[in-house]
């Protein structure tokens, strides 16, 4: 078992719940992506191809999958973990999905290590996450 097993299990359970309720799309954003904007989300929704399809946004190092829009959700099994971005692209292509990779600066930073919190502090903007980290006063000026 690895640190991403919980996310993979939660994604699988979510797919089952969506199917049971007749929902045809799944928009998954991990909780550690603090800089996304409403405009980026709207752009993803507008650019998502008709089913069967995968729209995917990588982490800035292109190793992680920081956003997935999958239609229908049952068309592929998500496998988060090391190098998940390229693994998801391969799984989608193998399963005959239209693949729509996109990149957005707000989706680039994910909080995996302490150094990522410093990146968050240095980043432009004033998100709730940034305000909270500043409030904790972890870094002395």
Predicted segments, located by residue:
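Short, glycine-/small-residue-rich phosphate/pyrophosphate-handling segment
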Residues: 70-92
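Conserved alpha/beta core of the MobA/IspD/sugar-nucleotide pyrophosphorylase nucleotidyltransferase superfamily
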Residues: 83, 90-141
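Short phosphate-binding loop-to-helix
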Residues: 1-25, 84
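Conserved hydrophobic/aromatic beta-strand scaffold that supports enzyme active sites
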Residues: 56, 67-69
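Short aromatic-hydrophobic micro-motifs that form the base-stacking/packing surface
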Residues: 27-29
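Acidic metal-phosphate-binding loop of nucleotide-sugar-dependent transferases
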Residues: 5, 33-35
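Short, high-confidence coil segments that cap the C-terminus of an alpha-helix
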Residues: 23, 51-52, 97
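Conserved donor-nucleotide/metal-binding helix-loop-beta segment in metal-dependent transferases, i.e.
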Residues: 36-62
